[in-house]
Each structure stands twice: as C-alpha cells, then as structure tokens.
Amino acid sequence: MGILDPYKGFGVTFSTMFKKPTTEQYPEQKKETAPRFHGRHQLNRHPDGLEKCVGCELCAWACPADAIYVEGADNTDEQRFSPGERYGRVYQINYLRCILCGLCIEACPTRALTMSNDYELADDSRDDLIFTKEQLLAPLRAGMESPPHPMRLGESETDYYTRDPDAPLPWQVGGSPADEADEAGEAGEAGEAERAADKVPAHGAGSERPR
C-alpha cells in the first residue's frame, strides 16, 4: 500500500462534492415520459361514448403474465355498450402480475386498449392493485354520452370503423347526442299532451257544463 493511496481515495470524494447533484425531487418534480411510454392501461371509447372493447378476450390470451381477466356479454337494443355484438362486461388487470410489455395492445383488434403515461402504480394494498373496468375506462369527453345508448355514428359496427375520422360528427352541427335524446323525449311528451288534449270534449254546443 503506497503512501499516496489514501489521498487518491479522498480525491474521488472531493471531486464529486462540487458536482451538480443529479437527484430528482420526486414527487415534486416529475420527469417527462417518452411518447410511447408503457404505463397504466386505458380502455378507449368511440366519439359517441360507446366502448371500443368487444369482449373478445384476445388481450387476455396474449398476456404472458396472465394478468388480464375479461368476461364478455351480449349487447341488446335496450342495453348497448359497444357497436359490436358483444362488449366487455368485466375487465380487470392485475398490476401485481403485469410486466407492462404491451403485447395486449398489439393483440387488440379494435384499438380498445392502449397504454398511458401514468406510471404511479405503487400501493400498500394488494386488492387496490387489481384495476377494474371502471378504473380503466377513458373519461367521457365533450359530446360523449354515457352508455348504454343506441349507436349514434351509424347503423352497424362497420360504420364506426369505415367513417372518415376527419369528418364532422353528426351532433357537431347541432347539439350533443344527449341533447338530441332530450329533444326527442320532449317532442314525444308534447305529442302525448296534444293527443290527450284532443280527447277532452270542448265546452260548447252539444256539451253539458258540469254543475
């Protein structure tokens, strides 16, 4: 051991003392993620609010960690959640198992499942790390209507995927789908009121006044 060896060790220490620290002040200062970052999943919607997920379970089959659980159900004319024949009634992702590989995104045929930039998934409860459909669904934006409701962008599922994405939506000329539904309901109530009024006999010739 040379006499200068201790000074060499301190030289490394002193040289780093005057360098700018690289510690990130998290969570006060969060680093921006890459555009194609693999974060928390999101279930997307169509412009009218219907869900893109058709309950095919291809994402669950593609998951190498067996982290996705899907139960599909049939749509009806009264209860429609997606343009297709089926929708995802139950959708769960277990983030205790998920490795954020993105294979489920590649397997999805309708682009219903994408990955967001949200990476803050730590929790002290195992149950809270099993995300349900309500937690994964994208929030309703302006012009969207909460399902179940009829199809607003066409008469079949094909119309939803063949429409021009740059074309204006039907309700952009007027109001939102919910406003159209309210107007239709008000028109129906007004028509019923008019029919009821027609059935009431008018007081005049040939009618008796109540005593």
From Swiss-Prot:
Q: Return one GO MF term.
A: NADH:ubiquinone reductase (non-electrogenic) activity
Name the catalysed reactions: a quinone + NADH + 5 H(+)(in) = a quinol + NAD(+) + 4 H(+)(out)
Membrane topology, from the record: Peripheral membrane protein
- Could you name the domain of life of the organism this protein comes from? Bacteria
One biological process term from GO is: aerobic respiration
Leader sequence residues: none
- What are the required cofactors? [4Fe-4S] cluster
> What subcellular compartments does it reside in?
Cell membrane
Residues annotated as binding [4Fe-4S] cluster 2: C63, C98, C101, C104
UniProt keyword Repeat present: yes
Task: State the coiled-coil residue ranges.
Answer: none
**What EC number(s) does its UniProt record assign?**
7.1.1.-
Q: Where is the composition biased (Basic and acidic residues)?
A: 152-166, 192-211
> Which positions does UniProt annotate for [4Fe-4S] cluster 1 binding?
C53, C56, C59, C108
Which enzyme class, named as a word? translocase
Q: Keywords in UniProt for this one? A: 4Fe-4S, Cell membrane, Iron, Iron-sulfur, Membrane, Metal-binding, NAD, Quinone, Repeat, Translocase, Ubiquinone
Q: Give a Gene Ontology cellular component term annotated to this protein.
A: plasma membrane
The annotated region (Disordered) lies at 21-41, 141-211
What NCBIfam families does this protein's entry cite? NuoI, PRK05888.1-3
Q: Which protein family is it in? A: Belongs to the complex I 23 kDa subunit family.
What is this protein called in UniProt?
A: NADH-quinone oxidoreductase subunit I
Organism whose genome encodes this protein: Parafrankia sp. (strain EAN1pec)
The gene name reads nuoI
